[in-house]
């Protein structure tokens, strides 16, 4: 692998230009038009066309399915956020001024920049639109009697964690890259994602590795390292303060329910645009009574349905056709799991009375077993197509350190370095 081929640099430059070509004009429209302006609707097909042009370029960025997926996901959710702020939430300059994000006397360029910053702030951190359950900074960064976080401590901690995560992703790829194609076909071949009772022991192990382990380690770290690098650059360049760059993932302890897995443990980067669509359909289109169980679960369903459409689009950009993607069934059954566990919890409360204090350990253990079983059963629908990719498309880091020092040395370095990190800078799992 070349480090940065000139063709890749040119492709990245083109993609950045296209990304700005639909986000910056959207910010301009938000600032300069009233909420009901026809121009907002007229801009929508232009926005979608630019996104389409962006999608055509993604496969030429790298040979890495992961990195191309990050690019496709970032652009797709940015486009959805544009539509959200223009047509659903319908923000305008007055609301941005009222929220303290811009000053009317500022130049047009400054006001557009403020709108653009809000647009790409998918979690709305530090604004009145901040989504729920955004994780707080680690205790290591939050010193007593200090209202602001130390930029130096933030940069040091994030840099150290990024190095560890880089080594981990490198180790995972180098450990699996020599898997024979026959083994991949036997474990993750087409149709095996829906095989349960007649699966072999080896295939059951494959379901565990993809359905449970991949969410806890490779998938989480893949997305987390991108977020950390992005925030680190913003803080180093003093574009953002450390306070605005909160962690992207929650703690594993929050994943003892399906609702907690998606609402607290997993990243909330898409939550604002996704929940806006769900609320819009349930309350404005269907006009369901609020509050009501029907409105609540309809909202949840359309939130996950929109997420399924986004992931389906990303798969298509990466060359996985809709017929070969399991995004739609995987995400659309999540509301059923949430309804089931809500019902069980409600019955339990009525039988035992309101809970007092912390949730008992045995209940949390049952919760983890439930979540693990659900992810084991359904995750292969969505993740197996990616697991079938050949090794030359599964690399996650541009330069392999593990390839130079060897697997055994890398394992020891990763273990020692991880322990030091955990105790020295407040590692959190």
From Swiss-Prot:
Localization (cell): Membrane
Practical and industrial applications: Pyripyropene A and its derivatives have very unique characteristics of selectively inhibiting the acyl-coenzyme A:cholesterol acyltransferase 2 (ACAT2) isozyme. Therefore, pyripyropenes are expected to be developed as a new type of anti-atherosclerotic agent. Furthermore, pyripyropenes have been shown to exhibit anti-angiogenic activity against human umbilical vein endothelial cells. Finally, pyripyropene A also exhibits insecticidal properties.
Listed EC numbers: 2.3.1.-
GO molecular function, one term: O-acyltransferase activity
Membrane topology classification: Multi-pass membrane protein
InterPro entries membership: Wax_synthase (IPR044851), Wax_synthase_dom (IPR032805)
Annotated protein name in UniProt: Acetyltransferase pyr8
Family: Belongs to the wax synthase family.
Keywords: Acyltransferase, Membrane, Transferase, Transmembrane, Transmembrane helix
EC class name: transferase
Major location (coarse): membrane
GO cellular component: membrane
Membrane-spanning intervals of the chain: 12-32, 39-56, 69-89, 154-174, 221-241, 300-320, 324-344, 365-385, 409-429
Functional description taken from the UniProt entry: Acetyltransferase; part of the gene cluster that mediates the biosynthesis of pyripyropene A, a specific human acyl-coenzyme A:cholesterol acyltransferase 2 inhibitor. The first step of the pathway is the synthesis of nicotinyl-CoA from nicotinic acid by the nicotinic acid-CoA ligase pyr1. Nicotinyl-CoA is then a substrate of polyketide synthase pyr2 to produce 4-hydroxy-6-(3-pyridinyl)-2H-pyran-2-one (HPPO) which is further prenylated by the polyprenyl transferase pyr6 to yield farnesyl-HPPO.
GO biological process: terpenoid biosynthetic process
Pathway: Secondary metabolite biosynthesis; terpenoid biosynthesis
Gene that specifies this protein: pyr8
Annotated coiled-coil segments of the chain: none
